[in-house]
């Protein structure tokens, strides 16, 4: 998003919102004036768990020894879909997208049947190996025949390069196939960017991030935002700093919903 310069006359400069979150949990936005790895490196310095991202290079050196880095199948699929849009006769991309649909269908079945992680893990182990084997064979075949600079060639290279990260879900039942949840959380930012035009000062960035964190966490937890704010704001000034965690959307939902 554009950030207005201090004098208000010079050209605006870019600011960036980074978003971190967990399925069924909070969404945390962090404002940074740069797009380099310094932001996620600092935020995730002591993180122990699974980090699912796209292939942006800034994520390659973040996290500690207890962090597992996973990739997103939706980002891979999108590249083959774009190849089809550019060439309707791209049989290889069409077949690959159809094979990916079989992979997503496994998790769709788990959702439809309200499976817990253990049951989903068993279903994946039963059905995913053959799907993945055929999918990888199709992509490897495409990579041998497509020009490296073509959309199909780039999509194939991208997917094969990230294959070990894309298949992490096979070992971690709690890992989703895609990080669409995070991408969906960024849509209000994209809409707002068109409406806001810019933010007035870089010091306003963290405040914007805090507001977005509260609103998006409420949305994820199905908390009525107005009801939540009406409940927590009146007593906020009289609450000690140590007790502020009691007023987060997650904590409030645990006792009020």
Locate the predicted segments by residue.
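Catalytic center-proximal scaffold of phosphoryl-transfer enzymes
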Residues: 1-257
């Amino acid at each position: 998003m554009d950030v207005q310069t201090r004098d208000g006359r010079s050209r605006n400069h870019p600011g960036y919102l980074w978003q971190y979150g967990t399925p069924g949990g909070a969404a945390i936005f962090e404002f940074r004036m740069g797009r380099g790895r310094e932001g996620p490196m600092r935020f995730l310095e002591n993180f122990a768990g699974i980090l699912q991202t796209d292939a942006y290079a800034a994520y390659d050196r973040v996290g500690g020894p207890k962090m597992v880095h996973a990739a997103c199948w939706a980002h891979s699929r999108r590249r083959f879909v774009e190849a089809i849009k550019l060439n309707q006769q791209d049989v290889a991309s069409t077949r690959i997208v159809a094979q990916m649909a079989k992979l997503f269908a496994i998790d769709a079945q788990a959702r439809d049947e309200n499976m817990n992680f253990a049951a989903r893990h068993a279903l994946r182990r039963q059905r995913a190996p053959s799907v993945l084997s055929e999918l990888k064979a199709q992509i490897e075949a495409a990579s041998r025949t497509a020009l490296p600079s073509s959309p199909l060639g780039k999509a194939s290279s991208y997917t094969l390069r990230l294959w070990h990260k894309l298949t992490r879900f096979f070992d971690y039942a709690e890992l989703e196939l895609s990080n669409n949840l995070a991408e969906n959380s960024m849509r209000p930012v994209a809409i707002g960017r068109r409406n806001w035009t810019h933010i007035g000062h870089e010091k306003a960035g963290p405040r914007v991030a805090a507001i977005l964190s509260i609103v998006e966490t409420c949305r994820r937890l199905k908390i009525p935002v107005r009801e939540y704010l009406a409940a927590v704001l009146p007593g906020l000034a009289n609450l000690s700093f140590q007790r502020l965690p009691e007023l987060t959307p997650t904590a409030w939902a645990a006792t009020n919903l």
